[in-house]
Amino acid sequence: MLREKTYILGIESSCDDTAAAVLCDGKILSNVIANQSIHQAYGGVVPELASRAHQQNIVPVVHQALKQAGVSKDQLAAVAFTRGPGLMGSLLVGTSFAKSMAMGLQIPLIEVNHMQAHILAHFIQKEGYKQPHFPFLAMTISGGHTQIVEVKDYFDMRVIGETIDDAVGEAFDKSGKLLGLGYPAGPEIDKRAALGNPKAFHFTKPKVKGLDFSFSGLKTAILYFIQKNTATNPDFIKENLNDICASIQYTIIGILMDKLKKAVQETKINRIAIGGGVSANSGIRQALKQAEHQLGWETFVPAFEFTTDNAAMIAIVGYLKFLNNDFTSQGTTATARLKL
């Protein structure tokens, strides 16, 4: 029987957000996310708690996604899910649920690479947002990843630069923890940075060859900076918080932009798309807009709802793979370390 419309259910469970979305022929009908606030008390994601919460959330989240979309499970053409990379326990919940649902409905199962989904989120149809033409450079920046990817086609991607230690999102969160900010600290640093002087304090940028990144040295430098200044003035952080946040953000954005400029120079590709949780940062968005005007780049910034982990990005990859008849078997397994 021919389907008039192609409905894809996307499931995302790579870290601490349980998400489900329904897409129809490239257009998102629903995008539901259940956040796990319990991790705030620990200053970071606790893997065991995350997987337990996914088990509690996944059925109601999928139910809500179908309900909001006005679609019954029998109308689904396929189930797409995040196979990796991510936290193994979290991935297992989403993978097991997706496999069971696809088997029960006797419909195709589609595995999705989480990092690929952050890039292809730009192809979700949303009013007011343009889609990049191939080839383009994608910079995926999040709490767990920092990469520059040369994208020649939907499924022809090559990582040309990545972090050799910590991810950029971790640099934001660990710096925020040193300043006494809550988790995740990135949004709070971004908010305070707008009120401070970005050149109040100087932090040395790490020197890394090629297009690779490093943030562990910067985190250590910030730690020593805080220790040194609070030793002489216990109120140093309180008195200078906005300036410290602005200076940290200015340094991190400088590192990202320096590598992007180098990537554009080497590849001769000046179409730039960003993705991942840190792409919500107002500073990096502003820096890209400046580069667009000053350097002639064409930049693509995702809608805020598609920056953090979400199932809409999984669904769009599922749809593109469905069109290619690119399905996976019930024998597939979750993989914590999955290469792009």
Predicted regions and their residues:
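Short Gly/Thr/Asp-enriched flexible loops that form oxyanion-binding sites at enzyme active sites
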Residues: F81-Q106, I124-Q125, S282-Q290
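Glycine-rich phosphate-binding loop plus the immediately following alpha-helix
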Residues: K152-L195, K219-T220, Y224-T230
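N-terminal beta-alpha supersecondary unit
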Residues: K5-P85, H114
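Glycine-rich phosphate-binding/hydrolytic loop that grips phosphoryl groups
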Residues: H118-I119, P302-L340
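A contiguous, well-structured pocket-lining segment that forms one wall/lid of small-molecule binding clefts
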Residues: K191-I272, N281-L295, F322-N325
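Conserved phosphate-binding/catalytic loops in two-lobed NTP-binding clefts
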Residues: E111-V112, I272, K289-I314
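Conserved phosphate-binding catalytic cores of ATP/NTP-utilizing and phosphoryl-transfer enzymes
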Residues: M1-E4, V112-F136, V317
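Short beta-strand scaffold segments in enzyme catalytic cores
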Residues: T18-L23, A138-T140, T146-E150
